[in-house]
């Protein structure tokens, strides 16, 4: 089976200290990979490099067979990303935020409304469409972050601490 993500000899240094060194792994289509480790182990650094938020010091990341250093724009089209602290805009409604996220992903304007509805349903936040983000609980703000990561129907999703503020029994109801 062809991998959707392949990481080869990935390393990153912040000034003097190495955050990660010589990491290798693959994620196959329909596969799941969890990065586990203590605080400061390099989990977020690895995810940020895969998603193109941070440049690696050494090594190569392939997304759907594309070397991200050679064609990062094409590679990023395949990725949905929820950072550890997603940038939420408190004065926007849920619908406005998800529409903006879809527009930033250069989605066909004719498909955005339906994509927003699907993402809200998959994350169980459809009933908050017109609510301001500031008025959502931390758990629902996290679900909104997940919805923005999947609104453009990416080939794979990278979620950094996705169950933050979630009730244990409700985590299983997310359709991501």
Regions found by a protein language model. Give the residues of each.
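Hydrophobic anchor residue at the start of the ABC signature
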Residues: 146
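Conserved ABC ATPase signature
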Residues: 132-136
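Conserved catalytic motifs of ABC-family nucleotide-binding domains
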Residues: 153
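Conserved ABC ATPase "signature" region
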Residues: 99, 103, 110-128
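Walker A (P-loop) phosphate-binding loop of ABC-type ATPase nucleotide-binding domains
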Residues: 38-42
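Conserved ABC transporter NBD signature motif
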Residues: 59-67, 74-75
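A short, flexible loop at the N-terminus of ABC-type nucleotide-binding domains that lies
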Residues: 1-7, 11-22, 29, 71-72
């Amino acid at each position: 089976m062809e991998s959707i993500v392949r990481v080869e000899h990935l390393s990153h240094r912040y000034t003097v200290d190495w955050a990660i060194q010589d990491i290798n792994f693959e994620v196959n289509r329909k596969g799941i990979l969890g990065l586990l480790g203590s605080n400061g182990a390099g989990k977020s650094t690895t995810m940020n490099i895969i998603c193109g938020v941070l440049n690696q010091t050494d090594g190569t990341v392939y997304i759907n067979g594309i070397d991200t250093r050679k064609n990062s724009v094409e590679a990023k089209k395949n990725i949905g990303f929820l950072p550890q602290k997603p940038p939420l805009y408190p004065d926007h409604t849920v619908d406005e935020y998800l529409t903006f996220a879809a527009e930033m992903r250069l989605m066909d304007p004719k498909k955005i409304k339906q994509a927003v509805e699907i993402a809200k349903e998959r994350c169980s936040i459809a009933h908050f469409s017109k609510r301001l983000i500031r008025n959502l609980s931390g758990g629902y703000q996290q679900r909104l972050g997940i919805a923005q990561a999947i609104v453009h129907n990416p080939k794979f999703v990278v979620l950094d601490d996705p169950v933050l503020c979630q009730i244990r029994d409700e985590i299983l109801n997310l359709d991501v």
